[in-house]
Amino acid sequence: MFKVPATDAGYGAISALLADGINVNVTLIFSLEQYKKTATAYLEGMARLLKNNGDASSIRSVASVFVSRIDTAADKLLDQLQEQQEAASLKGKIAVANSNLIYREYTEIFSGDEFKKMEKKGASVQRVLWGSTGTKNPAYSDIKYMTELIARNTVNTVPENTLEAFLDHGTVQETITADAKEAQGIIDALQRLGIDINAVCAQLLEDGVVAFEQSFDSLLNAIEKKT
C-alpha cells in the first residue's frame, strides 16, 4: 500500500491513486474531521475507478487512526487543570472516545447508499486501522488500546510486546460499536474545560508530518551516501 498522510494536500492524491488502481494506507489521522475527508477521498477515488471500468474488487485501503498520542497530549493539558475534579476523571479516556466517534462515522458512511452501490460492483470498505496502540502511560493497562478498541472490520497494528500481553491476559470482546453517546459526552466534557480536541489533533498532525519529513530526508541522505 502507498502511505499518504491525511492532509489537505494528501486527499487529492489519495483519490488519484485509488482511481489508478493503487492500494492506499491513509496515515496520520487524529481527528474526526480528518477521517471524514479520508472516507470522502476514498469514495471519490473508487467512483472514478469504476467510471473507468477499473476492477474495484482488487482495491484495498485502510484509514490509519493514531490513538495513544492523543491521550498523551490531552492528559498533559488535563494535568494543568488539577483543581477541577472533572479534569482528573477524563484522563486516559479521550483517545478511545475520539476513536469511537470515528468508528461511528465509518459505520454510517459505509452503510450508506453511495457505498452500497459501489459494493455491488466489487468494492470493499476502507477499514479503520488503529495505530499507535502501545500504552505509553504506565498508570494505564498495558493492553488498554487493544481491549478498548475491538470493533468489527477494524485492524490494530499492535506492538509485539502489547500483543504478547493481550494473549496472556486479554479478552476478545467487542468494545466499540456505532453507539457513541458516551464517547460524545467525554469529548463534550473536554470542550467544557476549555480543551479543543481539534486543536490537539491539529498539533499532533503537524508534529507527525514533520517527523515523516525528517525520516524521508534521512533516507535520501543514506541513499546518496551509498551512491
Annotated model-derived regions:
Residues 1, 114-117, 220-223, 227:
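Long, hydrophobic, amphipathic alpha-helical segments used as structural scaffolds
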Residues 10, 32-34, 206-207, 220:
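Short secondary-structure capping/turn micro-motifs that flank functional sites
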Residues 1-12:
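Active-site beta->alpha loop and helix N-cap motifs at the rims of alpha/beta catalytic domains
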Residues 122-226:
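Flexible, acidic glycine-rich loops studded with aromatic residues
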Residues 17:
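Phosphate/pyrophosphate-binding loops and the adjoining catalytic core of nucleotide-dependent enzymes
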Residues 14, 22-161:
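Catalytic alpha/beta core domains of metabolic enzymes, predominantly
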